[in-house]
Amino acid sequence: DVFGWRPWDVTTLLLKDFTDYGNAAARGSPNNAMIIDIAPLSLTYETFSPGERFFTLANHELTHVALMDVWNARDAGWRRFLGGKPMPLQEHPESILWNYLATPRVNVPRWYLEGSAVFFETWMAGGFGRAQGGYDEMVFRSMVRDDARFYSPVGLESEGIAVDFQ
């Protein structure tokens, strides 16, 4: 009970073998699910080799599910009213609002979800993992050396969406 989280519904685990490289995904809406590609992980651009890939992937993806599914009284009220956790559909733009009301934490910035999951996977591996990688240390040391600006979470989100990538 690390998270103090009571799941709204069961978490479905789908193991698949349709690719030549390992990966995983998680969702908290319309249901709790984890999908794991069982092929070996590609370590080409990684900063560490996981001791046991299913342990690492399960910790990482279950953190995503817990963060997206966690609920309070207001969320529970909307979930009961809407009959569950609606998934946003392109054909029904209003479903974006219903999804936000029932599962607001699904819509947090990606850096928050990924940062939390990477921290937890590293913690569960006894301090070995991507949260302690040399790459991150190099980036922060370079930023200090270059007197680069460290953004606050709000400033980072604002700056990140202000640039036109097209």
Segments from the language model and where they lie:
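Active-site-proximal alpha-helical
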Residues: 104-134, 140-166
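Juxtacatalytic substrate-recognition/specificity segment
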Residues: 1-102, 109, 158-164
